[in-house]
């Protein structure tokens, strides 16, 4: 895994105004017309492409943006299926790059304040599988990446189990 910086350079009213702000890989602009519509960013791999991410659920499947004192996160991951084929997550102002060029693991990323969230996540796990996003929606001020991180750590501790194949990314408690 390779870590790069994610920086929101501006908020603009139209997509056409975003490009001048995208100077370095990881630079981003939020297109905001009565709420966030698009995230436009310079591809973090350095290929020079501008990646557009839909943030408006009214326009179809959309990513969610989380802004907090810890930084900005975008959920779920971004996976370009053309050109450079980059796969990355945006978590707390960092871009974590995945794939053969970068490695795969981010589970070792630790957070000093994770203990309380880990307990809250464990309390919300049950016999039925839930996604990190579903669990995060039940925990005020949490983000799906933090919850997913906790779920994976709970699996390593033998307190939770992750589904397989189509249920990958869904977790349940081990009794």
Where are these regions (language model features)?
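Compact nucleic-acid interaction/catalytic patches
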Residues: 32, 38-40, 47-81
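Short helix-coil boundary/hinge micro-motifs
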Residues: 21-25, 30-35, 72-92
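A short, conserved structural fragment
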Residues: 155-166
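Residue-level detection of the helix-turn-helix DNA-binding "recognition helix"
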Residues: 43, 152, 156
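Short amphipathic alpha-helical interface segments
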Residues: 111-144, 148-149, 153
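Short flanking/linker segments adjacent to small metal-binding domains or redox-active Cys/His motifs
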Residues: 84-117, 121-127
């Amino acid at each position: 895994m390779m870590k790069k910086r994610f920086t929101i350079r501006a908020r603009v009213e139209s997509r056409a105004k975003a490009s001048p702000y995208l100077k370095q890989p990881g630079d981003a602009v939020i297109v905001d017309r009565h709420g966030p519509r698009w995230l436009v960013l310079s591809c973090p791999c350095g290929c020079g492409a501008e990646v557009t991410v839909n943030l408006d659920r009214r326009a179809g499947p959309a990513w969610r943006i989380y802004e907090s004192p810890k930084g900005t996160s975008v959920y779920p991951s971004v996976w370009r299926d053309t050109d450079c084929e980059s796969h990355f997550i945006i978590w707390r102002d960092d871009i974590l790059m995945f794939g053969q060029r970068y490695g795969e693991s981010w589970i070792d990323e630790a957070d000093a304040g994770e203990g309380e969230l880990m307990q809250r996540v464990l309390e919300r796990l049950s016999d039925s599988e839930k996604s990190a996003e579903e669990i995060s929606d039940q925990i005020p001020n949490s983000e799906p990446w933090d919850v997913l991180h906790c779920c994976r750590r709970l699996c390593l501790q033998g307190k939770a189990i992750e589904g397989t194949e189509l249920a990958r990314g869904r977790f349940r408690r081990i009794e």
